[in-house]
Curated annotation (Swiss-Prot):
Catalytic activity: a beta-D-galactosyl-(1->3)-N-acetyl-alpha-D-galactosaminyl derivative + CMP-N-acetyl-beta-neuraminate = an N-acetyl-alpha-neuraminyl-(2->3)-beta-D-galactosyl-(1->3)-N-acetyl-alpha-D-galactosaminyl derivative + CMP + H(+); a ganglioside GM1 (d18:1(4E)) + CMP-N-acetyl-beta-neuraminate = a ganglioside GD1a (d18:1(4E)) + CMP + H(+); ganglioside GM1 (d18:1(4E)/18:0) + CMP-N-acetyl-beta-neuraminate = ganglioside GD1a (18:1(4E)/18:0) + CMP + H(+); a ganglioside GA1 (d18:1(4E)) + CMP-N-acetyl-beta-neuraminate = a ganglioside GM1b (d18:1(4E)) + CMP + H(+)
Protein name in the entry: CMP-N-acetylneuraminate-beta-galactosamide-alpha-2,3-sialyltransferase 1
Record pathway: Protein modification; protein glycosylation; Glycolipid biosynthesis
Main location: Golgi
Organism name: Sus scrofa (Pig)
Enzyme class: transferase
Database matches in Gene3D superfamilies: Glycosyl transferase family 29 (3.90.1480.20)
Location in or out of the cell: Golgi apparatus, Golgi stack membrane; Golgi apparatus, trans-Golgi network membrane; Secreted
E.C. numbers: 2.4.3.4, 2.4.3.2
Statement: the UniProt record of this protein carries the keyword Glycosyltransferase: yes
GO biological process per UniProt: ganglioside biosynthetic process via lactosylceramide; N-acetylneuraminate metabolic process; protein glycosylation; protein N-linked glycosylation; sialylation
Key words, A-Z: Disulfide bond, Glycoprotein, Glycosyltransferase, Golgi apparatus, Lipid metabolism, Membrane, Secreted, Signal-anchor, Transferase, Transmembrane, Transmembrane helix
Length: 343
């Protein structure tokens, strides 16, 4: 049925082009030979001009001033961005390729993990296995997103109202908003966590679990039912109050996509920060970054605490902070995102 419909559409388009060509030719001819035209000439001219515009300008994937998905703006971006990659794990796309599964298992060197397929099957008996309808992009839209990091450069930035003006506000790990609203805003739609970085969330916030091991998926099951898991490599919350329908799972294959395509294999695996940035490229039309990088004095610390050792992660080799920062810098230079550097 679909091929027949496609052929009919193609045939109709061909006839339309032929009609415009013949009519334009006739009118040009009649202008020199006949004093009156059988058809309103202005109407055909306008139709012809509109058709030319349609053929000249490529389809824009959104109605924003900047559209992330727009192709042929940057070869660097086009080589990395893969629209077909699905950021969230669902019951329908839960199968992992063998190489992806083996790579993912090595991230935190989990010993004797339980069967992943069985774990995922049990997981989606507890939480919904479909994609968050809020994340599904409309055919034509302008979805503006703020990705808010944890950098101390947010202190006294007064970005709060600007951040809250976005359609989606994505935060990560232990970042609080209470008491810091003037600088970081009060709105949160989605919050990225893993078990060891979990913090209590407001009822309306969707939790996006970033799983780095099978135990992380098992923790979601446990934390919403029996509470049997209270320790991974550090203590973790045994129970969480997040509504089950508000729990989403970051796809392990998407983590590998970020590592392979965007980080080119730098570091051992991507940080939550860069994972949230690339995630946003796939669900948003415009992306603004806040709270990424060091402050103006070169200090790496969180906006909610005075922690001199906050930048120690840069020396562990787990994440390549410099390479990740370079990726966001290039994205900003080609107008795919904007970076607000604070103070």
């Amino acid at each position: 049925m679909a091929p027949m419909r496609k052929k009919s559409t193609l045939k109709l388009l061909t006839l339309l082009v032929l009609f415009i060509f013949l009519t334009s030719f006739f009118l040009n001819y009649s202008h020199t030979v006949v004093t009156t035209a059988w058809f309103p000439k202005q109407m055909v001219i306008e139709l012809s001009e509109n058709f030319k515009k349609l053929m000249k300008y490529p389809y824009r994937p959104c109605t924003c001033t900047r559209c992330i998905e727009e192709q042929r703006v940057s070869a660097w971006f086009d080589e990395r961005f893969n629209r077909s990659m699905q950021p969230l794990l669902t019951a329908k796309n839960a199968h992992l390729e063998e190489d992806t599964y083996k790579w993912w298992l090595r991230l935190q060197r989990e010993k004797q993990p339980n069967n992943l397929n069985d774990t995922i099957r049990e997981l989606f008996q507890v939480v919904p296995g479909n994609v968050d309808p809020l994340l599904e992009k409309r055919l034509v839209s302008c979805r503006r997103c703020a990705v808010v990091g944890n950098s101390g450069n947010l202190k006294e930035s007064y970005y709060g109202p600007q951040i809250d003006s976005h359609d989606f506000v994505l935060r990560m790990n232990k970042a609080p908003t209470e008491g810091f609203e003037a600088d970081v805003g009060s709105k949160t739609t989605h919050h990225f966590v893993y078990p060891e970085s979990f913090r209590e969330l407001a009822q309306e916030v969707s939790m996006i679990l970033v799983p780095f091991k099978t135990t992380d998926l098992e923790w979601v099951i446990s934390a919403t039912t029996t509470g049997r898991i209270s320790h991974t490599y550090v203590p973790v919350p045994a129970k969480i109050k997040v509504k089950k329908e508000k729990i989403l799972i970051y796809h392990p294959a998407f983590i590998k996509y970020v590592f392979d395509r965007w980080l080119q294999g730098h570091g051992r695996y991507p940080s939550t920060g860069i994972l949230s940035v690339i995630f946003s490229l796939h669900i948003c039309d415009e992306v603004d970054l806040y709270g990424f990088g060091a402050d103006s004095k070169g200090n790496w610390h969180h906006y909610w605490e005075n922690n001199p050792s906050a930048g120690a992660f840069r020396k562990t080799g787990v994440h390549d902070g410099d390479f990740e920062s370079n990726v966001t810098t290039i994205l900003a230079s080609i107008n795919k995102i904007r970076i607000f550097k604070g103070r």
